Amino acid sequence: MRCPKCGATKSSVIDSRQAEEGNTIRRRRECDECQHRFTTYERVEERTLVVVKKDGTREQFSRDKIFNGIIRSAQKRPVSSDEINMVVNRIEQKLRGRNENEIQSEDIGSLVMEELAELDEITYVRFASVYRSFKDVSELESLLQQITQSSKKKKER
């Protein structure tokens, strides 16, 4: 592993541990030349997933797009980046579990909505308002009524 400070190719692993629910190995390294310490992450290389968008165009699947979309929806909400990361991990796992190389963008949006409904209702509504691109307020009101009813059912249990 090349040192980010001096560019030397020799480094020693100081610490190694599992991260992201065991899907990644986090290694703390020290450069043998300049003693600079840095962190690397190792994960299994997955097959490439292609997202088919509404207009028919295709692009490579990006965890970052999902993560950033959720981060925007969760602004000023009590949702940690670790929680969001776990949501993104679950979504990616579900998508890869399908054994399909191409995934519809609507399927990804639906999975995000399912996860956010469990995580935080306000984040869910914010994401839904962009994802579903409501035509008028009545569509948003309908969604809010659904959420209110499901919240009442959860509390009754």
UniProtKB/Swiss-Prot annotation:
Residue ranges covered by zinc fingers (unnamed): 3-34
Disulfide cross-links: none
GO MF annotation, one: zinc ion binding
Highest rank taxon of the organism: Bacteria
Cofactor comment text: Binds 1 zinc ion.
Cofactor(s), by name: Zn(2+)
Keyword line: ATP-binding, DNA-binding, Metal-binding, Nucleotide-binding, Repressor, Transcription, Transcription regulation, Zinc, Zinc-finger
Pfam families: ATP-cone, Zn_ribbon_NrdR
Region of interest (Disordered), residue spans: 1-22
Biological process (GO), any one: negative regulation of DNA-templated transcription
Domain ATP-cone: 49-139
Function as written in the Swiss-Prot or TrEMBL entry: Negatively regulates transcription of bacterial ribonucleotide reductase nrd genes and operons by binding to NrdR-boxes.
PANTHER family hit by this protein: TRANSCRIPTIONAL REPRESSOR NRDR
Similarity field: Belongs to the NrdR family.
Protein name, as recorded: Transcriptional repressor NrdR
Organism from which the protein derives: Streptococcus pneumoniae serotype 4 (strain ATCC BAA-334 / TIGR4)
Lineage: Bacteria, Bacillati, Bacillota, Bacilli, Lactobacillales
